[in-house]
C-alpha cells in the first residue's frame, strides 16, 4: 500500500518504486536495479545514514553536473533531514571543488526547489 504522502517513491509492500513509476515496463532492467538494488539495498545499509548518503549523492551529482538527477536528490536530501541552509552551504563549498559552473547550476536547482515549496 502506498503511504499517504502523494509523491512518495516507497510502497510498504514492494519497497522503493521510483524506477517503476518513471519507466514502468519500458526498461525493466533499469527499474530492477534502481528500485531493488540501489534504493532497497544500498540506501538501506547501516554504516551511513540516509542523510549522509543524500549529502554524498548531492556532492557527486553536483561534481558531474547532473542537474536532472540533482533535482530529485536535493528534494530527497530535504526529506532525509538535510536543511536548506545546509544544502546551500554544501553547494557553496562544492562550487570551489567541482567548478563554479557546477556550483551555480546546483544552486539554481536548489533555489527552484525552495521557491516551489515556499509558495
Feature-to-residue mapping (PLM):
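Short, structured motif recognition centered on aromatic/hydrophobic residues
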Residues: 53-61, 90-91
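Short, charged low-complexity intrinsically disordered segments located at boundaries
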Residues: 65, 87-92
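Short alpha-helix boundary/capping elements
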Residues: 60-66, 98-99
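Winged helix-turn-helix DNA-binding recognition segment
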Residues: 82, 86
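Substrate/cofactor-recognition hotspot
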Residues: 93-95, 99-104
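Acidic, glycine/proline-rich low-complexity segments that act as flexible tails and inter-domain linkers
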Residues: 1-51, 64, 71-79, 102-119
